[in-house]
Amino acid sequence: MLIIDTHILVWWVSGDKSLSPTAAKAINQTLDSGSEVIISSISAWEISMLIEKGRLILSMDVDSWIDEVSQVDGVRFISVDNEIGIKSTQLPGDFHKDRADRMIVATARKLAIPLVTADEKIINYQHVKTIY
């Protein structure tokens, strides 16, 4: 089981070449093994915000896109529950202030699973295992 960051989700679904071979392999091996690829529900919010700001264009409306992603075998969205919300404000060490990143990292820590991300700020954070 692993969790993917928002940009990784977009790159993976769209087949974007920005997705590293290591990240693609980790996602594919996870799905092929019958395990789950986890996506924080904050990613749906983040994608919607990027669309509203004109920074992301999808091939369909965001509701349909998220619905299609959720239909992929082995992909599961996890809601931001109270524990994740609270833990995102109490991350150990020095971590940047991006709320979505904090929620995703808190989810990875709660589930004790690696996070697939290209975000250097997260990769350099010593309190979560990353893949990229």
What are these regions (language model features)?
Residues 1-39, 53-68, 111, 121, ...:
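Short, well-structured N-terminal submotif of metal-dependent ribonuclease cores
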Residues 3, 38-41, 79, 116:
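Short aromatic/basic micro-patch
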Residues 8, 43-44, 84, 104, ...:
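Alpha-helix capping/helix-boundary segments
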Residues 20, 44, 63-66, 81, ...:
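A general structural signal for well-ordered alpha-helical segments in protein cores
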Residues 47:
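Phosphate/NTP-binding elements of NTP-utilizing enzymes
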Residues 57-59, 72-118:
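Active-site neighborhoods of divalent-metal-dependent phosphate/nucleic-acid chemistry enzymes
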Residues 127-132:
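Active-site regions of enzymes building and remodeling cell-envelope glycoconjugates
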